[in-house]
């Protein structure tokens, strides 16, 4: 049986997983984590709701962030603010025991000035809805040139 350690997950991230009561990898995590930790490749992963997709793509992102570089290195685009908030919260919890990796979530329905202020601080991982990201780019607040990792999160569907 696979373990997070056998997938190449660091002890610090495993501690974060355990803090979320996640002890064994799911199928989507077993298929994606080792591949994505090795190198940023194009990867399409599909799995049911509640199977750990967020951890499947965010763990490799977290482990490949250079925390000494104060720039946005990963972009996660998501369709709704609720999903963006959820993703940012989980990444924050996963990084609890790592070197300081900073995640910011930006989305409509909140004051853009507060989000601009947050982005002036060090941000490594940006979680954004498309509309708010475009608005911030038009204002020249977000520089995506240093981004090495991009994840497009699809909307959950129930069948």
Language model: regions and residue ranges:
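Amphipathic alpha-helical segments that mediate coupling or scaffolding at interfaces
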Residues: 16, 20, 35, 48, ...
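Conserved nucleic-acid-binding Ia/Ib motif block in the N-terminal RecA-like helicase ATPase lobe
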Residues: 71-135
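Conserved small/polar residues in nucleotide/adenosyl-binding loops
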Residues: 150-159
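Conserved pre-motif I regulatory segment
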Residues: 2-44
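Walker A/P-loop
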Residues: 42-57
């Amino acid at each position: 049986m696979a373990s997070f350690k056998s997938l190449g997950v660091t002890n610090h991230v495993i501690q974060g997983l355990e803090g979320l009561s996640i002890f064994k990898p799911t199928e989507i995590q077993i298929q994606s984590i080792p591949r994505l930790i090795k190198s940023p490749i194009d990867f399409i992963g599909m799995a049911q709701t509640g199977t750990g997709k967020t951890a499947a793509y965010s763990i490799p992102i977290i482990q490949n962030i250079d925390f000494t570089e104060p720039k946005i290195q990963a972009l996660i685009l998501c369709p709704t603010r609720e999903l963006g908030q959820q993703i940012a919260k989980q990444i924050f919890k996963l990084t609890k025991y790592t070197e300081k990796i900073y995640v910011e979530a930006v989305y409509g329905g909140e004051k853009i000035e507060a989000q601009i202020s947050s982005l002036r601080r060090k941000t490594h991982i940006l979680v954004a809805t498309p509309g708010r990201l475009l608005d911030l780019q038009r204002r020249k607040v977000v520089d995506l040139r240093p981004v090495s990792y991009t994840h497009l999160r699809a909307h959950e569907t129930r069948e």
